[in-house]
């Protein structure tokens, strides 16, 4: 009985590790989805629901959290030494802040959504980019401007041209989005036909 409990514990720990660990190659969408087939299903569902391309969802997550489910902004430092508070409440795959996450849950009815779950994170990105298209008239295929709005917020978008940092970040997201897109053209059909599940 004791051995059975120990084995069960190892299975649970393995399951948690497999679900939460960062994919080995986050620069390759095919590699990501070969390791995390459920992620492909969730991202595809989000695209079907909101119209936000899978490759843009991935590019935003890579920039925001590096696919780290527990990602948080680094703490600020007092006198460059003493750890201080974090600059924002950003958390999880999508790095959504508390207020926007609560708005998402309220508007979508997804009351049990959590930022550490990939399924909820890509749905959040779909919701946010869809609202960006509605509010700012930015196409969901415009990775550069969609990311600016994602990072700066709908109200802060208008001032981005004076912000070199966000421009450089948005260019990186746009470039990565295009790379993911080309990769998915090569492996998308095989992912669609696969029936097995890889965590």
Which residues does each PLM region occupy?
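Bacterial N-terminal signal peptides that target proteins for export
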Residues: 1-8
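C-terminal motif of bacterial Sec signal peptides marking the signal peptidase cleavage site
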Residues: 17-18
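Catalytic glycan-binding domains that act on GlcNAc-containing polysaccharides
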Residues: 21-192, 198
